[in-house]
Amino acid sequence: MNRKLSIFSAFVTFTMMIVLLMGGTVTKTDSGNGCGTDWPLCHGELIPTNPSVETMIEYSHRAVTGVVGLLIIALCLWTLVAFKDRLDIKIFAFLAFIFMLIQSIVGAGAVVWQQSDLVMALHFGISLISFASLLILTILIMERSGQEFRESVPAFLRKLLYGLLIYTLIVVYTGAFVRHVGATYACVGWPVCSQPTMTFEAWVQMIHRILAGLLFFYTLFVHYTAIRLKHRTSRTGMLFATFFISCQVATGAWIVLGGHATYVPLLHAFLITCYFGVISYLAYHAFRTRKKDSRLR
C-alpha cells in the first residue's frame, strides 16, 4: 500500500464531499445566479467586489470546485505512475476526472445558457458518480498488494446490487428535480399529500416520495438477502446502507414537516451521498468477484 497516496486519495474524496454539499447550499439558497451570467468570472470580475451573500455562496462554490478539480487531476496522474499495472485503478481515476469535468461543464452551462430544470437535475447525480469513483479508487489504493477476494458474491445478490445502484441514480435524479422546480414544499403532509388539489409541483414531490419509499424497501430486501446468503462483505455494507437510507427517509420527512433550516437539506444530501458510495462499492465488489480473477487487468 502506498501510504502517502492513500492519504491524499482519502483527502481528495473528502473534498469532493465538500463540493457536493456546497452545491446543495447553492441550490437551497437559490444562489445559482449569484455571479450573473458570467463564467468563470463573477459579474465580469476575477474576484467580485462588494459581493452579496448569494454571490459569496456561488463564487466560493466555483473556487472550491476548481481547486478540487486540480486535486483530482493530480491524483489521477499519481495513480497512473504508482499503479501502472492496475487497470481497475486507472478506470476509476478516469471516471472520477471525467465526471468532475462533466459536472463543471453542466454547472457552467447553467450559468451561461440557463439550462432547463431537467438538465440541471443531472448535476447532482453526475457529482455523485465522481464522488463514488473517488471512494472506490481510495479503497483500491488502500488494499494490500496482491490481495484477492475469494468470497464470490452469489449471482442473485450480485444482480440485486446492480439494480439497486441503477435505481438509486433514478431516485437521486427525481430528488434533484424536486429541488430545481421548487417542489420541496409543494405537498402538505407526509408521507402523502393531503391537500385537495394537486399541482404539477405536488405531483413531482409525490412521485419522488413513492420512488424513495420503494428504494427504502429495496434496500431492506437486499440487506435481508445478504444476511440470508451469509455474504460477509455485502452484509456489512448493506447494514451501513440501511442506516443511511433510514436516516435519509427521516430527514426527507423532516424537511417537509418543518425542517426549513439550510442544514436539513444538506444533511439529506450528505446521507444520500454516503448511501450511494456504499452501494457503488458493493456493486463493484460484486462485479469483480464474479470470476476467479478478482481484478481487472
Swiss-Prot record:
It catalyses: Fe(II)-heme o + 2 A + H2O = Fe(II)-heme a + 2 AH2. Pfam families: COX15-CtaA. Pathway: Porphyrin-containing compound metabolism; heme A biosynthesis; heme A from heme O: step 1/1. Keywords: Cell membrane, Disulfide bond, Heme biosynthesis, Iron, Membrane, Metal-binding, Oxidoreductase, Transmembrane, Transmembrane helix. It is a multi-pass membrane protein. Its cofactor is heme b. Its main location: membrane. GO terms for biological process: heme A biosynthetic process. GO terms for molecular function: metal ion binding; oxidoreductase activity, acting on NAD(P)H, heme protein as acceptor. This is Heme A synthase. Heme o binds at residues 61, 123. Its EC number is 1.17.99.9. The active site is at residue 58. Belongs to the COX15/CtaA family. Type 1 subfamily. Catalyzes the conversion of heme O to heme A by two successive hydroxylations of the methyl group at C8. The first hydroxylation forms heme I, the second hydroxylation results in an unstable dihydroxymethyl group, which spontaneously dehydrates, resulting in the formyl group of heme A. Residues 28-62, 112-121, 182-201, 258-262 are extracellular. The chain crosses the membrane at residues 7-27, 63-83, 91-111, 122-142, 161-181, 202-222, 237-257, 263-283. Disulfide bonds join 35-42, 187-193.
